[in-house]
Amino acid sequence: MIKFVDMFSGIGGFREGLTRAGGFECVGHCEIDKYANRSYNALFDTKGEWFVEDARKADPETMPEFQLLCGGFPCQAFSTAGSRKGFGDPRGTLFFELARLAEARKPEYLLFENVPYVQKCIRYIMYTNQICIAPPKNSGARLFLLCFTVHNMFLSAKR
């Protein structure tokens, strides 16, 4: 059973998907929107799980053991419908909270979701050494940045 923490959980898309996939157990979540969090708690049994409202206040020392850190950090800073300021937008910098927690806890797996433009921003900061989420050389680990459109998921919307 792979234990995971659901960051920027919204109403629980990652949790629902991982639950349906099987072999995953959620041990905590983070969500700042009180209405989304209320829905999350109504949809899932979260009693006894770790919770923090604001990712910027997440203390890695208080987090339970987990192998997978997942999160769909806010996309407005990276989307064509939003500002597209990337990490220049305060919402875009929430990606760094995931990186901070990953650096501190070193989970076996990271699973992040966002719009395609975020790849460009992440690659830039990796190449300029502003942050390192790439695995160390000779570690045997690999980093994959994959881009899927809703068409890959058989949905008719274009995003």
Can you name each region flagged by the protein language model?
Residues M1-R159:
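Conserved active-site and SAM-binding loop architecture
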